[in-house]
């Protein structure tokens, strides 16, 4: 016999070597004449599976390459952002070092030390600002008090000057006394002249006496002191006399009295 009988004889046809009906189970006993067909079917199915697996591998490789490219671009962006951030931070630290005084950064090289010294500098500035504010407030109080006092003094002075002017206009302060009294006494360097005059004569009294002494070739004024006592002025003049010259004290006194 050329072939082994099968249990079932499937009613199916082969076209182009492909099995169109698989509704029947093939018998384990297949004719030797059908071996070529079976191998052809197996080869074609395996080829299609290989093609499908190659497509899957190619697609997976493309996806992997795409993911790698995305990951690399993200890394580059991150590096650029980090580089820019570090440059900005470095410029800020340089600016901070320029703002700090030398005594705060002397011997300090690290960035952390600079930050600590910057905090200390800010605290010191706050303390100084507080002290200056307190000093300003004290000065303001003193100025306001001084202004008030000055205004009160000006009012009092104006009232006194007006009353004094009215008093002088009506009567002199040296009623019953002389307008000017002169005492001339000898001293170690020459003579000492003490003049007491009232307010009305004070303006011209001292200048006239000094002018007279300057015109006299025998006298050289050493010192001149003035003081006020109540309504009169006291002038003390010390004048040096040239060597070998005699001074008539009474004559000098009369000259001063008659000025």
UniProtKB/Swiss-Prot annotation:
GO CC terms: nucleus
Domain (bHLH): residue spans on this chain: 73-125
CDD domains noted in UniProt: bHLH_AtORG2_like
Transmembrane segments: none
Superkingdom, natural source: Eukaryota
Predominant cellular place of this UniProt entry's protein: nucleus
GO MF assignments: DNA binding; DNA-binding transcription factor activity; protein dimerization activity
SMART domains: HLH
Keyword list, A-Z: DNA-binding, Nucleus, Transcription, Transcription regulation
Presence of the UniProt keyword Nucleus in the record: yes
Name of a matching Pfam family: HLH
Places the protein is found: Nucleus
A biological process from GO: regulation of transcription by RNA polymerase II
Subunit structure: Homodimer.
PANTHER family per record: ACHAETE-SCUTE TRANSCRIPTION FACTOR-RELATED, TRANSCRIPTION FACTOR BHLH125
Name of the molecule in the record: Transcription factor bHLH125
Naturally occurring in which organism (per UniProt): Arabidopsis thaliana (Mouse-ear cress)
């Amino acid at each position: 016999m050329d072939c082994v009988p099968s249990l079932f004889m499937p009613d199916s046809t082969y076209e182009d070597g492909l099995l169109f009906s698989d509704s029947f189970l093939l018998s384990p006993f297949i004719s030797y004449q059908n071996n070529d067909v079976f191998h052809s079917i197996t080869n074609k199915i395996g080829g299609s599976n290989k093609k499908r697996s190659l497509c899957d591998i190619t697609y997976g490789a493309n996806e992997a390459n795409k993911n790698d490219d995305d990951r690399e671009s993200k890394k580059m962006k991150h590096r650029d952002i980090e580089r820019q951030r570090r440059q900005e931070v470095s410029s800020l630290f340089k600016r901070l070092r320029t703002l700090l005084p030398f005594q705060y950064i002397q011997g300090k090289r690290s960035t952390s030390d600079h930050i600590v010294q910057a905090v200390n500098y800010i605290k010191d500035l706050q303390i100084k600002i507080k002290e200056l504010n307190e000093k300003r407030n004290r000065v303001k109080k003193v100025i306001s008090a001084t202004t008030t006092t000055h205004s009160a003094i000006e009012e009092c002075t104006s009232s006194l000057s007006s009353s004094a002017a009215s008093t002088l206009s009506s009567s002199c302060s040296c009623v019953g006394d002389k307008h000017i009294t002169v005492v001339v006494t000898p001293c170690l360097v020459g003579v000492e002249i003490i003049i007491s005059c009232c307010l009305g004569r004070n303006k011209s009294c001292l200048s006239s006496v000094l002018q007279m002494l300057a015109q006299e070739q025998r006298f050289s004024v050493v010192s001149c002191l003035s003081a006020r006592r109540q309504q009169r002025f006291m002038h003390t003049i010390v004048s040096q006399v040239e060597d070998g010259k005699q001074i008539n004290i009474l004559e000098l006194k009369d000259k001063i009295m008659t000025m």
